[in-house]
Amino acid sequence: MLFRSQDRNQAAGSFIAMLYLTGARKSEVLLAKWEHVNWEDKTLFVPLTKNGKSRIIYLSTLAIDILEKLPRIAGNPYVFASQHIRCQGKPIGEPRCAYERVLQKAGIEDRDEVCFHTARHSVASALVSSGQYSLYDVKAQLAHASIQSSQRYAKLTSERSRNISEGLSSMIQA
């Protein structure tokens, strides 16, 4: 696994993992507070999104496990809390160096082309290309304001096109 709790910077690694596990925006994860985590419902409440609305992010068992292993810093309400003395009570800064290490371990060569927002693109593309989720599912998961934002990920693979063709044949022959 690319994200280990024993890494030098557990908060940074966990932050990066949460981006890929939720498809949330960088700011939604960085500004998450412990009071917004509902352990029973496995959700994270985001009081203010880019779209000016609140939203609920549903957390997987793995995401909950990652959150449970994070230390709570006294006097700091943030899930991804800075441990630096001069940043007491604030979230961590953008962990670009940690992200660089993750990208290197993953064998990604064009690291200059990859940013934190790329995680959202990766999540959306993975959901759409799996064939298990609709564009409306992607819209909801990523909190897109409109379906048009989600449509950019709707690229048909040759395998998917072949499956559609076979499915049509099966329907006609039935």
Show where each model-derived region lies.
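N-terminal core-binding DNA-recognition domain of tyrosine site-specific recombinases/integrases
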Residues: D7-N9, K53, R86-E94, D110-C115
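Short, leucine-enriched amphipathic alpha-helices that occur as contiguous helical runs
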Residues: A11-G13, A63, I92, R120-H121
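C-terminal catalytic core of tyrosine-transesterase DNA break-rejoin enzymes
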Residues: S14-A17, L21-E28, T118-A145, R152
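Short, polar N-cap/turn motifs at the start of nucleic acid-interacting alpha helices
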Residues: H36-T43, D112-E113, Q132-R152, N163
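Non-catalytic DNA-binding core/recognition domains of DNA-processing enzymes
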Residues: L59, P95, Y99
